[in-house]
UniProtKB/Swiss-Prot annotation:
Organism: Shigella flexneri
Record localization: Cell inner membrane
Gene: cysZ
Protein's UniProt name: Sulfate transporter CysZ
Alphabetical UniProt keywords: Amino-acid biosynthesis, Cell inner membrane, Cell membrane, Cysteine biosynthesis, Membrane, Sulfate transport, Transmembrane, Transmembrane helix, Transport
Principal cellular location given in the protein's record: membrane
Pfam family, one: EI24
Length: 253
């Protein structure tokens, strides 16, 4: 099926919504199963454990609030909960993406072929296995780019006042951008676009990608819905690639 997508770019919210529609397309569902299973097992177990620990973690987090901000505690409490969910959700979604990276790449490749009518390389299961070292190297590049920035933001959480007010907002913006990079990278990587070139391309449509990443980040925090977010985000990012980036960066047509 050739896509009815136009070359005119839409908002990041649009592409996120498209992800939910595309994930259930006939012929695509079988490529969704493995990423979905990885996400359900890892994110489901991780968030179940998290919710058993919140009554310990949140009071500890709130103990860093200085006395002069105690009058804002009724506002800072939900911010503390959101902060824990953001950091925890992003950490475990990163692990899930590492494990499912080869299958996410295959999903992006097959969906792109369906949307455009193009013929992808005939990889098959053996081609995927052969490509695993390169895919893992790509995931490592993302991790190395992300880690020092994440550490700086996490340090802010331990600064009284800033850690309970400014840091959660900065972390949300950072995780939105990083999740846009994470999921948009799959269709870019199927065309062997270098990591640095991919980041440069995303910056040309930064608002669109921040919108997409922000919704992905929010849904990663929501129990049950976050179990399905990985394949949905891959599909949405692939739709964005087809509309916004494919003409310039595609290796196969």
């Amino acid at each position: 099926m050739v896509s009815s997508f136009t070359s005119a770019p839409r908002s990041g919210f649009y592409y996120f919504a498209q992800g939910w529609k595309l994930v259930s397309q006939p012929g695509i569902r079988r490529f969704v199963i493995l990423p979905l299973l990885v996400n359900i097992l890892l994110m489901g177990g991780a968030f179940w454990w998290l919710f058993t620990q919140l009554d310990v973690w949140i009071p500890t987090f709130m103990s860093y609030v200085p006395d002069w901000l105690q009058w804002l505690s009724y506002l800072l409490w939900p911010l503390a909960v959101i902060s824990v969910l953001l950091v925890f959700g992003y950490f475990f979604s990163t692990i899930a993406n590492w494990i499912a990276a080869p299958f996410n790449g295959l999903l992006a490749e097959q969906l792109e072929a369906r949307l455009t009518g193009a013929t992808p390389p005939d990889t098959g299961i053996f081609g995927i296995m052969k490509d695993v070292p390169r895919i893992m190297k790509r995931e490592w590049q993302k991790f190395v780019w992300y880690l020092p920035r994440a550490i700086v933001l996490l340090i802010l959480y331990f600064i009284p006042g800033i850690g309970q007010t400014v840091a959660p907002v900065l972390w949300f913006l950072f995780s939105a951008w990083m999740l846009a990079i994470q999921y948009c990278d799959y269709p870019f990587d199927t065309h062997k676009v270098p990591f640095k070139e991919m980041r440069t391309a995303l910056r040309t449509r930064k608002i669109t990608n921040m919108q997409f990443g922000a919704l992905t980040s929010l849904f990663t925090m929501i129990p049950l819905l976050n179990l399905f977010i990985m394949p949905v985000a891959v599909c949405g990012a692939t739709a964005m690639w087809v509309d916004c980036y494919r003409d310039k960066h595609a290796m196969w047509r």
